[in-house]
Amino acid sequence: MPFAGRLVLHNDPNLDNVVFRHGRAVALIDFDLASPGTRVWDVAAAARLWAPLRLDDDVQDARHGRVLHRFRLFADAYGLTEPERAVLVDAVIANHDWLYEVVQGGARAGHAGFSDYWSAARDRAERTRSWYLRATTQLRASITPQP
């Protein structure tokens, strides 16, 4: 895994794996992808899924139109250093690729959950990856500390 480290990370903090009470996240579930990693990898996974870092056309809730602002909030809330921010966008792309390789592998192996998810998410995943590559400069600028 890229960005290997010494922290134990969930690696799939999508909203289906979070338990909410009264509108607040109180627990993570489903640790089948947990592994060692770094803070940057953890922020990349969370921001990718929670900001969410994808085209506005693929965001159908109150987060629509606020992707770059929410990405900045993630970097700021985690207190990322300038060197960590410098590699965060690369980590987002690597995290996206890594997770979808896991999903594709599960689908190829006949795992029903992965197969169902991949058939529904493939097009969005491809659109999102293309957007990351087109918007890399914009994504980096959104998390660069301002003087």
Where are each of the predicted segments found?
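Active-site acidic catalytic loop and adjacent metal/ATP-binding pocket
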Residues: 1-42, 52
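Secondary-structure boundary elements
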Residues: 21-23, 79-82
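Loop/helix-junction capping segments adjacent to catalytic residues or to phosphate/diphosphate-binding pockets
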Residues: 36-37, 68, 82
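Short, surface-exposed, polar/charged, turn-prone segments marking secondary-structure boundaries
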Residues: 36-38, 55-57, 115-118, 129
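Active-site activation/catalytic loop segments of kinase-like enzymes and analogous catalytic loops
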Residues: 43-79, 95-106
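Eukaryotic Ser/Thr/Pro-rich intrinsically disordered, low-complexity regulatory regions
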Residues: 87-88
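ATP/Mg2+ or Mg2+-diphosphate-binding catalytic cores
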Residues: 99-147
